[in-house]
Amino acid sequence: MFDEVIYMGVHGVAISATVRIKRISWGTVARWLESAARYAERFNQRKLKGFVIHELQADEIRTFVGDKEQVVWVLTTLEVWSRLWISVVVGRRNFRNIKTGILDTLQRGRIERRFLFTTDGFEMYEWAVKRLLAGVCIYGQVIKKRREDRVIRVERRLLLGTKSELEEALFHSEDSNTLNTSFVERHNLTIRQGSAYLGRRTPCHARHSGSLMGQMALMMMYYNFVRPHMALKFGKMVRTPAMQAGLVAKRLSFREVFTAFFIFFFIAVAARCCRLEFKQSRQGFWRE
């Protein structure tokens, strides 16, 4: 039942709905999700590294925690060729968090040649990229002009690198024909659909940033290692982003990912039972 609850948690099912469906207590569901999120974060730190960076895109998701006045942003970074979700940062939309996301990406991945990096027009990206990635990437921005929530014009800016270098990078890209943020925007839609906390116009929201970050760590593990990606399908063989990036040889299951967690859980339960039994036997000895 543990893996079923986690599976529902990464498919947009709120805790209250999970309680009604599985007929278990709210506290049990919340505790299982919290434990799974902690383990998923450690799993990501251990497994999500050593891949080659071919093409990057970054974007943000706007949401809130606690109440609608406490706006936070979820910064995501995507490796386009493998569709690997590399980094996530929850917090304010500022230079510090963007810098944190870029540094995390650099620490996890390997750079074999200058890669293409595309973001939206937020100026903090330009500052961070020119300080951290000068000489290792070709950087451009895609700026969408809107009127009444409709895109009326798209402007593309090349801010790092030459036009010939951009053309060469696009020639080698298997996905992009021009500067775009389409892949990370579609990825962010997948995140919104999978997290009850990020749904628009919903009463379900995270109580604090830690809960939201835990949810994102759990979803990152599921997206990269468990969930098959249809864009990576090869014939009848379905693949995950981690398989495409060469991090694992097969699609993992929740049971495989959480094997160590299950072992620790059963050992902890057994130890607790032994302590209770020893305590009861000792109390009986002194009564005699």
Predicted regions and their residues:
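Residue-level recognition of single "structural anchor" positions
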Residues: 1-270, 274, 278, 284-288
